[in-house]
Amino acid sequence: MFRTLMNAKIHRARVTEANLDYVGSITIDEDILDAVGIVANEKVQVVNNHNGARFETYVIPGERGSGVFCLNGAAARLVQKGDVIIVISYVLVPEEKIAAHRPKIAIMDENNRIVQLIAEEPAHTVL
């Protein structure tokens, strides 16, 4: 049996742009993607901390070092520039490997820079 577990999380990134006329997806700084192991075209869930919206889309790598988090297409209606979001990817893990699974979690600052990389959810609130 397989379980769906969190594989990567980008916590408290700020939306830098919303582009309604683009075909679709979320564009994320490729350095940040590399840090948490999310790849181009990977399906992700996006959670908007400002309005509670949750939606799925896929990832397009953005310019390295830019800090870009741009929601494209229809998803652009669910965010505004400056909103704080969480981006989560999931993976199917065989039951026998669950105990060894460690997600990669990037805690972001207000400029979309990684301030901490952790391998498990903290037991307290992280801002």
Curated annotation (Swiss-Prot):
InterPro entries: Asp_de-COase-like_dom_sf (IPR009010), Asp_decarbox (IPR003190). Its EC number is 4.1.1.11. SUPFAM superfamilies: ADC-like. Substrate binds at T57, G73, A74, A75. The modification Pyruvic acid (Ser) is found at S25. It comes from the Bacteria. CDD domains: Asp_decarbox. Pfam families: Asp_decarbox. It is found in: Cytoplasm. The keyword Cytoplasm applies. Gene3D superfamilies: 2.40.40.20. The keyword Translocase does not apply. GO terms for cellular component: cytosol. GO terms for biological process: alanine biosynthetic process; pantothenate biosynthetic process. Is synthesized initially as an inactive proenzyme, which is activated by self-cleavage at a specific serine bond to produce a beta-subunit with a hydroxyl group at its C-terminus and an alpha-subunit with a pyruvoyl group at its N-terminus. Keywords: Autocatalytic cleavage, Cytoplasm, Decarboxylase, Lyase, Pantothenate biosynthesis, Pyruvate, Schiff base, Zymogen. It catalyses: L-aspartate + H(+) = beta-alanine + CO2. Pathway: Cofactor biosynthesis; (R)-pantothenate biosynthesis; beta-alanine from L-aspartate: step 1/1. One of its GO terms (molecular function) is aspartate 1-decarboxylase activity. The active site is at S25, Y58. Binds 1 pyruvoyl group covalently per subunit. Belongs to the PanD family. Catalyzes the pyruvoyl-dependent decarboxylation of aspartate to produce beta-alanine. Heterooctamer of four alpha and four beta subunits. PANTHER family: ASPARTATE 1-DECARBOXYLASE (PTHR21012:SF0). This is Aspartate 1-decarboxylase.
